[in-house]
Structure formats: C-alpha cells, structure tokens
Amino acid sequence: MDKFIIKGGKRLHGEVVISGAKNAAVAIIPAVAMAESPCRIENVPNISDVKLSARILTAMGATVRWLGKNTVEIDPTTIHTNVVPSELGRKMRGSYYNIGALLGRCSKAIVPLPGGCDFGVRPIDQHIKGFKALGCTYSLNDGMIEVSAKELRGAHIYLDMVTVGATMNIILAAVKAKGLTVIENAAREPHVVDLANFLNSMGANISGAGTDVIKIRGVEHLKGITYSIIPDQIEAGTYMAAAAATRGDVLVKNVTPKHLESITAKLMEMGVTVVEYDDAVRVRCDGPLSKCNVKTMPHPGFPTDMQPQIAALLSIAQGTSILNESVWENRFRYVEELKRMGAQITVAGKSAIIEGVEYLKGAPVRATDLRAGAAMIIAGLAAHGVTKIEDIEHIQRGYEDIVEKFVGLGADMYLMLDPTNSDTAKIG
C-alpha cells in the first residue's frame, strides 16, 4: 500500500496557501442538481471526496467539466435519475446531501446509507426528522434509503442535537418547499453559512445562517451561478498545529481568521504566537509548549475535526492536558498510533489524559481516519527519526497536495508508492 514517509525534526517555515473547504464543497456540489442552468464552482479542493461528489452527479446524468485543478462546471439539466449509485455513495458520508438536493429537484431520492470516517454509529435520525416534517415518507431497502414527498411543505423543525449534516440537508430540502421552514438549534459552522450563501446567490431565500435559528422561505426557481467556496478551516488549523509542533514560523494564507478563533485561542494558551492579517495568519513557536485543556464543541467552539491534531501537539507539551470529545463517540482510535511514537495518553470514556513527553520517536503508524491521519503527520514532523504512515487514502480524502505543501515548508516528507498497485505505480 502507498505510504507517507516523514523524517522528523525540521522546523517548518515559509508560506502555505489553504484550499477550499471540503465540508462546504461536498454539500454545494450536490446542491447544483437543483439549478435550472449550469453552475461554475471555484476554489474547489482537489481531493478525493470532492471528486467523488462530482462523479455521483455524472453518474446521474449531469455534465461535469473540470476547468483546471480547482474549478468545476456542472450542467444539471441532463440529470435523468433520482438514484445515487450504491458503489459511489457508500464511499463517503457526504453522499447523504444528495437526499436533500434531489428532494428539492424532484421530491424523491434513493441514496445508499453513507460511508466515510467511522467514529461510531453516525445516526441520520435528525435528517429523517427534518424530512418527515417537510412532508416526506421514507423506507430502507438493501442498504438504500428512499425518501419522497407528494409535495414539500415548510415546517418548524427543532433539532434534538446540533448537527451540521442534518442542518445542511434540511436546508437543501426546504429551499423549494412551499412556505416557511424554521430550523431551531441549527449548526452555525462556516460551511453551513457557505451553503446558504451559495443557495441565496442562486435565488433562494435563506436567513439566519450562522445563528441557531435558520429560516428558509421556499422559492420556485434556482438559477445557475458562478461561486467561490470559502477557505478550509480545518486544513488551516492543521498547518497551524504543524507549525507549532515543529517550533516553526509559517504564514498560512487564504484563510478567514474569524473562522480560526477557537484554534488560535488554544494555540496561544499553549504559548504559540499567532498574528492575524486580513486573509492570513502567521504562526510562530520559539519555546516549549504549555499544557492546555481542550473540549470539542459545535461552532464557535473548538472543532471536533481538529481534536486529533491538537492531541498530537499536546503530547509534546509540558505538563498534563485533558482533551474532552463532546461531539463524536469513538474518536480516540488514533491514540494507540500516537502511543507507538512514545506519547503518554490514557483514554477514559470521552476524555483523553495526555502527559506531555520531551519528544516523540518515529514509528510505523496508521491513519485510522482523515483527521487522525493529519495528526500522524504532525507527530511525524515533530518526532525524532522516521515515521511511516499507512492507510493514507483517508488523508487524501480531505487534504489537497499535502505532501507538496509540507515539502514547500521545509519538511522532509514524500509519498512512497506501492509497486504492486498497478494504478498508483504509474504515478510520477
């Protein structure tokens, strides 16, 4: 299998440009299905999850053209089915956004139960609750969920928990429903706002995105537009953590500093210097890292998608830190991999107690999921010796050109291709 090989101990320095937000792109691309003319989406991250989102539309009949590396033009007028192919949809969790988009397009969707990273049961009960409130019925058959409505009607929906996926999926389904839909206890993440901005640019009538009450007044038509996706908050946070872990000095460009405030606050608490500019942040770390307690929370709290990366950083901080995961269950599987490198971490339920060590040691490790893989890279960059990371396909789902970007910052890192894999052995 392909691997990332990292020789640690080099301070990162220089500039890195952040790509478009994965979590926005995987909802915006399915949303194009509701447009009555082609859309051009810019600042699209060139990653496998996004390519898969586009492949799903192609399989349903849409005309998809890539105009360079980070721009895609999609003509949805040729879509001829409301069924997402099982072999594609099962590969990623974000495939469930096709339910909301297809409901908006034709009031019926047949989509495989979602895949993606496995942090537990990943229930979609809040999605179903929203769809039922809008007038839908649903059934499950052979791993496929079928959702349909004779007519979508606006409704008042209270989410039992703050959930990004359900918030965005209900927005998609409600955009063309008759009347007013109100979502209470809605997620406030930047990618929720980006989806709403995209839909409003198409002609939707959505207000309150970025607050916990979102109102959607249904419209009849959505037009094709050109739209640029926001920068990726989690990719930016990953490079910020890597700069701190290696005692580096890195300018992280093409970011929205306000989206990074919770990450910035914790880094500064650990003794890292962070300077904000209009569309960049500079991260510099000269001395030892201090212990810090972190609890993941829905936005604007500390993001769960940065939890593994901050754990890698805390593992080399002075003192004892406590990391509490309040969003996902079963998100500490990567801890065993960090322990292979010498980290001293004890997991108790939804908390990890991290005793900082002077340094980590390079070792063979696995990327157990997307963000855990990013944590392994950070640990490898800071470690003494060589780290070999397997199962890197998880990392490639969410980070564009990650090797090239880290090498550009001075890292000693490369991709080792599996010579027995005929697909990858041809690369380069």
Question: Can you say where each PLM-predicted feature lies in the sequence?
Answer:
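Short, structured segments at the rim of ligand-binding sites
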Residues: 1-428
